[in-house]
């Protein structure tokens, strides 16, 4: 390839824009029931699609959304759940319902892609993210929180506003939780073209975006559903109070697939022994999280920290665990209701896998991608937008560059080659400089 051709390819990649839509609730296992809809079919015929997106543990919406947007695991970005308790300070995080949840210095310590892009002088627009209330510095150029009137991206007039934003912004992000909210009520097993009305509305709005992508040479669309959902029959809900003396428990945090336990001082091993050996909860297992002692699977990356106590209960898919005693749960005033379908389980469980869809000039045409991870999607966005300063991610571009068109892939690899040369030269210069200084 000539230098002129390479420069041209790099300029083409440099000029690209991205719309990233996070549409929670589309399960990879059940996506085939919906793939025939026009708004989805375009990705199979003209773009890239995968039904094997591996989420991170716990497979809950907020930790996975933040991993997708930061490119790092929850243990690094700190959002370990939707309900969190700093057992050292007593500070609570209540799933973006309390003002204190939005304090950047307390909870939001790793920059997501929209802040990194803003720092890199890219123009960023965000729609319907609760995170718009965080006091980011610098703040995105446009950040619209969830609307009070209930309008979402699935409403045509709102979708048209998003389309217009793609003409003036380099990165447009849309958060759409409505599909998940509906599937949580009806369950994924019952979701089909008749019952999943939110899916129908969403894919119709999506057609407006794909039409815009088709008409332009600079716009690309990525749709991600980070994880799936699992039906939980009412008879599969376990109550912690029935299996351990609650006077041994200081408090429990969260409910459903994962519940943290903070024992009374000096009672941690007794609680563990009760729940592991004497009166184990059927289909729910207790684990230590302490390093070297912890017995959770390594791929969970779930270790003791200021928001992860010594003990955690993990339910098998299709089961859930709650606490009856409101004085022994965090937050105390909230009822621990388990919906028809929930998430949070083993991130390797097939029904937890999510969906990835991509369409635009930088992507291949009609390509069925195999497995990929949320961090990989972060890396793809960084490379397409050519943003410097992205987080040192758990994603790998070489794991996913097969989804790119041949020209884009060549430009990406050329950039990687230049970066590797720069790093090699820098590593050689450091000892030389030290020798000069010492001499």
Please annotate each region the language model reported.
Residues 253-380, 388:
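Active-site neighborhoods of enzymes that stabilize oxyanions during catalysis
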Residues 227-264:
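Acidic/histidine-rich catalytic neighborhood
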Residues 20, 39, 201-240, 381:
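Metal-dependent active-site segment of extracytoplasmic phospho-/sulfohydrolases and closely related
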Residues 408-429:
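C-terminal GPI-anchoring signal of eukaryotic secretory precursors
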């Amino acid at each position: 390839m000539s230098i002129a051709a390479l420069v041209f390819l790099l300029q083409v990649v440099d000029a690209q824009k991205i719309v990233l839509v996070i549409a929670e609730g589309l399960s990879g296992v059940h996506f085939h029931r919906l793939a025939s809809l026009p708004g989805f079919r375009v990705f199979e015929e003209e773009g890239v699609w995968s039904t094997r997106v591996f989420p991170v543990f716990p497979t809950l919406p907020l930790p996975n959304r933040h991993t997708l947007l930061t490119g790092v695991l929850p243990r690094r970005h700190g959002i370990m759940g939707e309900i969190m308790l700093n057992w050292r300070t007593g500070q609570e995080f209540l799933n973006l319902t309390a003002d204190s949840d939005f304090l950047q210095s307390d909870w939001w310590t790793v920059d997501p892609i929209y802040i990194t892009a803003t720092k890199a002088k890219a123009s960023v627009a965000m729609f319907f993210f609760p995170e718009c209330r965080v006091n980011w510095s610098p703040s995105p150029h446009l950040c619209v929180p969830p609307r009070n009137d209930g309008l979402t991206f699935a409403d045509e007039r709102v979708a048209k506003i998003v389309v217009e934003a793609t003409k003036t912004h380099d990165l447009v992000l849309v958060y759409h939780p409505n599909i998940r909210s509906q599937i949580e009520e009806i369950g994924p097993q019952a979701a089909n073209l008749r019952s999943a009305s939110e899916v129908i509305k969403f894919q119709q709005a999506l057609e407006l975006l794909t039409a815009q992508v088709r008409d332009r040479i600079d716009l690309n669309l990525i749709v991600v559903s980070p994880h799936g959902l699992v039906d939980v029959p009412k008879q599969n809900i376990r109550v912690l109070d029935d299996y351990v003396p609650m006077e041994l428990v200081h408090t429990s945090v969260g409910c459903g697939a994962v519940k943290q336990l903070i024992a009374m001082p000096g009672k941690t091993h007794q609680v563990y022994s009760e729940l592991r050996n004497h009166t184990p909860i059927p289909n729910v297992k207790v684990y230590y999280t302490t390093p070297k002692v912890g017995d959770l699977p390594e791929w969970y990356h779930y270790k003791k920290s200021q928001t992860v106590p010594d003990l955690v209960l993990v339910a098998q898919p299709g089961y859930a665990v709650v606490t009856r005693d409101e004085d022994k749960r965090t937050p105390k005033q909230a009822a621990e209701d388990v919906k028809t379908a929930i998430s949070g389980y083993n991130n390797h469980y097939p029904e937890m896998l999510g969906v990835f869809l991509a369409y635009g000039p930088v992507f291949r045409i009609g390509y069925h991608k195999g497995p990929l991870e949320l961090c990989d999607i972060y890396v793809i966005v960084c490379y397409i937008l050519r943003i410097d300063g992205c987080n040192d991610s758990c994603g790998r571009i070489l794991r996913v560059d097969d989804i790119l068109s041949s020209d884009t892939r060549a430009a990406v690899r050329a950039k990687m080659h230049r970066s590797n040369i720069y790093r090699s030269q820098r590593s050689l210069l450091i000892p030389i400089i030290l020798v000069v200084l010492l001499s």
